[in-house]
Amino acid sequence: MSAIRKIIQRQLFQKDDERIQAIVNVSKLDGKKKKNQTLLCLAVTIEHPIAVRLYFVKGEKDDTFKKKDRFNLREVREIDGINPKKASPEFHITIGDHQYVILAGSAEEKDEFIRELYKLSCQYLPVQMPDFCNFSLPQLESETSIIPIELPEHDMAMQSDYQPISNKEDADFRKLIARANLTIGEAHIFAEMLTEQLQSLDGANINSMMDSENSVNQLLSSIDAALTGVESVEKELDRCDDILAFVRNSIELIEEKDSLSVVERKNKQRLNEEIVSFVNSLQAVTDSHIETLKQANFSNPESVQRCTDAARAVAQFWHGRISKPMLQMKAYQDRNDELTAVDVFVDRLMSHLSALFSNLNDLSLDHEWHELCIPKQSQRFRALSPLSDLINWLKTNRPKACNLVLQKYIDSTNLLYKRLFDNFFETLINKVPKANSSEKKSKANESANISLRSDNQSFLSTSSEIDTEVLPQLIETVLAELSAVIDAEQKFVVRFFHINSELLAQFDTTSTGSGDSSSLGGRSMEKHMNEQVRHVMGNLFDSLNIHLDSFCRAVCRHNPSNVLLLFVIMSKKVLLPQDPSSYFSITFGSLVVLIKRQFDAFIQMECSQYSEVRIAKKTRIGILPSIFRFANFVRRAEIIFENAERRTDLEKAYFNLCRAVCDGIQKAAANQYSKSPSSVVKFENYHELYLTLSELKISCLDQQRKDAKALKEEHIDAYVKEFMGRPLKEIQTFFDNVNNFIETRGIRPDEISYQQQFSRIELKKVISQHPGKEVKKGLEQLYKKIEKNLVANSSLLQVVWRDMQEQFVKQIAEYNKLILTCYPGSKIELEVSTDTVLQFFSEIAQQH
């Protein structure tokens, strides 16, 4: 590029006294690629006035160049570098109303050209400078890169003073000349006029300054007088400031004395409160109170009330608002020493409560009650209620003693309820077999007319049906009695022992201190209250779960299918709203869990009995009893679960039982002691299972019904293929060997007759062994064999015989096809045709 620059400088610019400052090789101009080389040159004139110009130079033949377009720097409006963050050779120049899109040879050429153009614009065109956008502008250097020629000294002065005027300055200058009725050519006359006006103005200014000398002197005198006044004012301000300082100190002293008086008043008030509180505490407990505690009679309600008042007075003395230093006073110590009688009172109270708990429990056991009812404890509660306030006082002042009393109550009451539950559940369990026996008697006639086709120990037979009326009544009795007893005991325990009193007090204190009781705090308090109540109630009724479990086992032991009815009853009740704070909800939940376990165990037992098939040696299996047992189970379950909510558990049980039945069929078919063919056992039982499921119409078992049908058809095909070759045994063996020989040796079918063992003579010999009479005789034996393998009066006999016919006809056709393929032109045929075979099958079927 430097060589081209020198050539262009010498050919084009040197003769015009111009110097190239920057040059860029233009690859594309306005999106068009130039055939000849095009250059964009930035040049300045050497002599003054200096002018900056842009040239488009076009390359010609023979390495010559020609100036094509010329533009002055004033005409350039905008230079756009496109993207300052990305090196790109493209940039735009707007000259006049036209925008040139230029693609330089490289990004470096573009940057150097725009940088030089910016420097020249700043130096020679600062007012009408073009807009440079999307380009990192360089910092201007103190020296310029233009090196003009040496000029005379006066020319240098002209160069340094030269500043181009702006358009506004030019317009203002023309207005001034026009106002003087002059032209640009008469500028020297205008300059002389301005000089004369300037001289007249200077003279006027001097005369004005001379005339205003007296005024200036007067002004200075006024300023001096003002300064003197300011000094006097400052002295007065200093005097006032001293007075204010004295007042400020006096006020601070007064405030200090006032604060001390406030402290003194507060101290006197607090001292008065302390003394009043101390005196009230001392006066709270009198000698009569102490005497009342010493002579307490807990059997007398009036004495109990007096003891309660005395105990509250002692609590007021102990918990009064007395500061620690006041506790060291002799009056307090003396009164506190006199309260040793409280310890004796507490011991007597604990002894009385222990004896009272035991006596009341014995009294509750001695009362006669209905056999299916749990005795109510209202009398025991009324006897203990007067002591509730003393228990509350004991809980606040003697928590360890209160815990011992609570534990004694739990131990004694636990024994009471254990005995009551023993009697109640023993009577209840004895009612269960009576209910079943009465049901057996009422349905004896009905059960005699029903054939189950199952073992005699099936507890799902109609002779052992559950009592759908008595058993729900027993469950209702259990729940009603337990609910009444548990709720009454819970209310009494909470009220008598004040279980939640400290939590309520703590919650009230927290709410008062915070000014707000949030719902989160309320839920937390309720949770703690329920935990405490459940802990106490759980210890009181720890034997209840054992009795409930025994009751469920007894009901299921007399008839395991009772668990279905229990499950349905409890499933309906579990949807009813329950009080979460009641301990009975926990008991109810435990009963639901126990019944669900019994339900799962019952289904598991049924599955094991369905899948484990016991077969005597050398016996024909026939239809398994598990299928009839499964059908009876489904029928009974559908009656029990009618309109029930928990169908999901029942459908899951159906699925497991049906799978167990299928497992039993597979095990029975594979049993080594069975005389029945494996495929016969499978398709007969799968057929029976399919009929059973079709009759029951259980939607969740629809897929199992389809699978049973598919398995039946699969094993019928296997059975038919197994016994198919018996009427034509030698022919089947012959052609099986032919097919194997062709496949293993790879010879052509029409060449098989050349083998000695497969010659035409051998084929005729084999065919002659199966005349029509022999084939019919073999088919009759096959029919008898099938009839013997199937159960008596089986509906599948004709189905199997029809499949056997179709398979036999296909076999005959296949043999004829092999004869035509392997023995072409031999005219050898089987002695029985397809029509003859069909006639044989029809005659045999009609005979039987």
UniProtKB/Swiss-Prot annotation:
Keywords: Coiled coil, Exocytosis, Protein transport, Transport
GO terms for cellular component: exocyst; plasma membrane
GO molecular function, a single term: phosphatidylinositol-4,5-bisphosphate binding
Domain of life: Eukaryota
Pfam families the record matches: Sec3-PIP2_bind, Sec3_C-term, Sec3_CC
Keyword Cell membrane: no
An individual GO BP term: protein transport
Keyword Transport found: yes
Subunit structure: The exocyst complex is composed of sec-3/exoc1, sec-5/exoc2, sec-6/exoc3, sec-8/exoc4, sec-10/exoc5, sec-15/exoc6, exo-70/exoc7 and exo-84/exoc8.
Reported function: Component of the exocyst complex involved in the docking of exocytic vesicles with fusion sites on the plasma membrane.
Family indicated by similarity: Belongs to the SEC3 family.
Name this polypeptide is given: Exocyst complex component 1
Organism: Caenorhabditis elegans
